[in-house]
Amino acid sequence: MALAIQLRQPSRAQPLPGLSHTLAGTDSCDVCNSTNLPEVEIISLLEEQLPHYKLRADTIYGYDHDDWLHTPLISPDANIDLTTEQIEETLKYFLLCAERVGQMTKTYNDIDAVTRLLEEKERDLELAARIGQSLLKKNKTLTERNELLEEQVEHIREEVSQLRHELSMKDELLQFYTSAAEESEPESVCSTPLKRNESSSSVQNYFHLDSLQKKLKDLEEENVVLRSEACQLKTETITYEEKEQQLVNDCVKELRDANVQIASISEELAKKTEDAARQQEEITHLLSQIVDLQKKAKSCAVENEELVQHLGAAKDAQRQLTAELRELEDKYAECMEMLHEAQEELKNLRNKTMPTSRRYHSLGLFPMDSLAAEIEGTMRKELQLEELESPDITHQKRVFETVRNVNQVVKQRSLTPSPMNIPGSNQSSAMNSLLSSCVSTPRSSFYGSDVSNVVLDNKTNSILLETEAADLGNEDHNKKPGTPGTPGSHDLETALRRLSLRRENYLSERRFFEEEQERKLRELAEKGELHSGSLTPTESIMSLGTHSRFSEFTGFSGMSFSSRSYLPEKLQIVKPLEGSATLHHWQQLAQPHLGGILDPRPGVVTKGFRTLDVDLDEVYCLNDFEEDDTGDHISLAGLATSTPIQHPETSAHHPGKCMSQTNSTFTFTTCRILHPSDELTRVTPSLNSAPAPACSSTSHLKSTPVATPCTPRRLSLAESFTNVRESTTTMSTSLGLVWLLKERGISAAVYDPQSWDRAGRGSLLHSYTPRMAVIPSTPPNSPMQTPSASPPSFEFKCTSPPYNNFLASKPASSILREVREKRPVRSSESQTDVSVSNLNLVDKVRRFGVARVVNSGRARIPTLTEEQGPLLCGPTGPAQALVPGGLVPEGLPLGCPSGIRRNRSFPTMVGSSVQMRAPVILTSGILMGAKLPKQTSLR
């Protein structure tokens, strides 16, 4: 109780330095124990509605006045050393504090009592805390000590167990010694048996020395044995060491050898590695090459397959073309036969239709497309209107029927596409020419023996198209230029069928025509007007390409002259004259179309066009070698006058010259009429490129072009196709037009080419000199050609009397030759069919002062077979024998000036006088072979 009283005594602890409590009230009620104390916010316990305060007092320091409890009541530095009894009693006192709750309730309204109770509670709590701290400290100390003691006890237990084990071991050892001692002294043991527990110590003491001595002896003996064993082991060890050393030396030696081998092997390995690397590179390179070669092989295989396919296709195409070619050759032969028959029929019809008493020269050397030819024809027609003809009505009906059939044939002609059938290209297709070749018009009559040589110019084509215009109707309006028919059509079969009908009609009337022809020939012979050989009573003096009793298919196949505007009835039937045909043709050419896109234009260069690498300035003469000639010359002397000369090799065919290409044009269409008193004219040609090889059909006679460079007529069907666009120089002359213009006081320039001297000076064979440089048939790219330094110009020299120039036809030349030589001409010297009674050229010649020479001898008709060419005879000697398609160099009677490069355009020379009254001498001229070779291609 004394302790409790002591604790309850209020003891005011002094506040520590810096300690202060502050009470701050939210209602501005400040309760302070000093002026500088902090404010404290408290909650009043007297009333429930009092404002709340926040305590801002520092609990570490107490207060210095009695209004507040000064804490802590016990200094932290005070050491409370209480005994266990004190602590126990104090705790009991604390447990009795619950009894004071009622006291506090009773004194609730007494502030002082409550304060004192709170102070007591504070002191009790603080004291209890101090007691608890001291107890915890003591408990911790005791716990640590207890753990330490437990560890020590564990160690002690281990030591005790070890000691016990050692003690047991020693006890067993002692028992062992004791048992051994008992065995050594059995008597003593037996006499005086001792218990174990009692005699153990004495036995140890008794036997200790003996056992030790015995053990010492045993140890010494054992030591000696061990020493001997050690010596033996040492000796063995030395032996083993020596062996080991020897073994080591051997190993070192082997190792050294192995190192040397390893070094050498390493070097070899390095070399092998390098070789392997190099070989690997080579293998890689070879593999790449193999891959490339495989790719190339695949590409080559693919290409090979393609080429094989192309080759197969080419072979199939070749076989097909060969079969088509055979068919075309068969059709060609059939068409040729029908063509010859149609030509003969047409000629006979013309003979029957028109009387032979007043036939004028229809065509001079004017081309079909020239205005001069139309002027001449118009004038002649006006003159003919004065003397009307009265032909037989039956013959007119036959003519009308023939023309009607021909129009049907023209309408059904084939439109097979051909590179020549291009509108505006001045050409027509071969098939078009084939089926329209038999059309007889006043302006164009074509006779020929070889349809492969057929090419129609645009003039003739326009006439044929106008002829069929009435029959075709609106069909022509749907056709566009340059749009031919499709291949394989039945046009050819239809045309052949119609031609076969015409052939039957012809065969039925042929006999009548032949009888009528013989009757006329007899009448002419009786009158003494027949002076030449094979006479054909037609208006064509050169139409020898017929089968007749007098000329068995002579070499002049296709050299037919036609009457242009002399036949008004036929003109009304075939072509109604609507203005100028030439102007109409020019109007067609002026219409824009793509037909002539491949034709060259002067001053216009086609994009991508390349000319041939040939010398354009080279000029070829007739005496040059052909590339296929053997160099043999046919002797011009010693030939019989009327003996046919056979040439077995005249049918030689050279397909390498069958191609041609038009690159230059020499079309001299002019109205200048050749007059003896005019000036000379010089014409210089201009070439775009060299012509392609022309077809050549000769192998013996050199310098014989296939087609005439300059012919005084329109080329026939057979001749004009020999070269697709034959080179000709169109220089027109007309005897009739000259006379008509002269009567009206019109004169023109003089063309006096040296080669036109057809009159000759004496014997033509004896006066032959190689002065002419005419154009050979060999193309410029031929290896047998003779180049010239510069391109010659058209230079005409007057080497003959002036009246030679306008007499450009063959009969006129013969007449002049007769006049100059003043001697008659044998009847065998003429191979042309001339109806003397129908010629009025002599009347015109008389007006120029030329006497008429009449030979009343009978005409001797030479016979020619198909394998023989025609025979030309000069006045005094044998004529020159010509191969098919050739022309003799002498005289060049058909008007090719010296040095003229061949014209690549088609317009040809139109025949001169058709009916003449004088015999004709054909000493040197254009002769077509009896049989033209078959061409392998229509191109």
UniProtKB/Swiss-Prot annotation:
Q: Name one GO molecular function term.
A: GABA receptor binding
Region entry Interaction with OGT, spans: 655-669
Query: Which superkingdom heads the taxonomic lineage of this protein's source?
Result: Eukaryota
What family does the entry list?
Answer: Belongs to the milton family.
PTM comment: the record says: O-glycosylated. Glycosylated by OGT; glycosylation in response to increased extracellular glucose levels is required for and leads to regulation of mitochondrial motility by OGT.
Q: What is its main location?
A: cytoplasm
Residue ranges of the region described as Interaction with HGS:
359-509
Q: What SMART domains does UniProt report for this protein, alphabetically?
A: HAP1_N, Milton
Q: Which residues are glycosylated?
A: 444, 677, 716
Reported function = Involved in the regulation of endosome-to-lysosome trafficking, including endocytic trafficking of EGF-EGFR complexes and GABA-A receptors. Involved in mitochondrial motility. When O-glycosylated, abolishes mitochondrial motility. Crucial for recruiting OGT to the mitochondrial surface of neuronal processes. TRAK1 and RHOT form an essential protein complex that links KIF5 to mitochondria for light chain-independent, anterograde transport of mitochondria.
Q: Which residues carry this modification: Phosphoserine?
A: 534, 716, 905
Domain HAP1 N-terminal per the UniProt entry, residue ranges: 46-353
**What residue spans carry the region label Disordered?**
472-492
Q: What is this protein called?
A: Trafficking kinesin-binding protein 1
Q: How does it assemble?
A: Interacts with RHOT1 and RHOT2. Found in a complex with KIF5B, OGT, RHOT1 and RHOT2. Interacts with HGS. Interacts with GABRA1. Interacts with KIF5C. Interacts with OGT; stable interaction is not required for glycosylation of this protein by OGT. Isoform 1 interacts with OGT.
Coiled-coil residues are 106-354, 490-524
Organism of provenance: Mus musculus
Expression across tissues: Widely expressed with the greatest expression in brain, liver and kidney. Detected throughout the CNS, including the cortex, hippocamps, thalamus and various subcortical nuclei of the forebrain and midbrain, the granule of Purkinje layers of the cerebellum and the gray matter of the spinal cord. High level detected in lower moter neurons (at protein level).
Q: Which disease is it linked to?
A: A spontaneous mutation (hyrt mice) causes a recessively transmitted form of hypertonia neurological dysfunction characterized by postural abnormalities, jerky movements and tremormutant. Hyrt mice have much lower levels of GABA(A) receptors in the CNS, particularly the lower motor neurons, than do wild-type mice, indicating that the hypertonicity of the mutants is likely to be caused by deficits in GABA-mediated motor neuron inhibition.
Q: Which GO terms describe its cellular component?
A: cell cortex; cytoplasm; early endosome; mitochondrial membrane; mitochondrion; nucleus
Keywords linked to the UniProt accession: Coiled coil, Cytoplasm, Endosome, Glycoprotein, Membrane, Mitochondrion, Nucleus, Phosphoprotein
Q: Check the record and name the Pfam families matching this protein.
A: HAP1_N, Milton
Where is this chain's protein located in or outside the cell? Cytoplasm; Nucleus; Mitochondrion; Early endosome
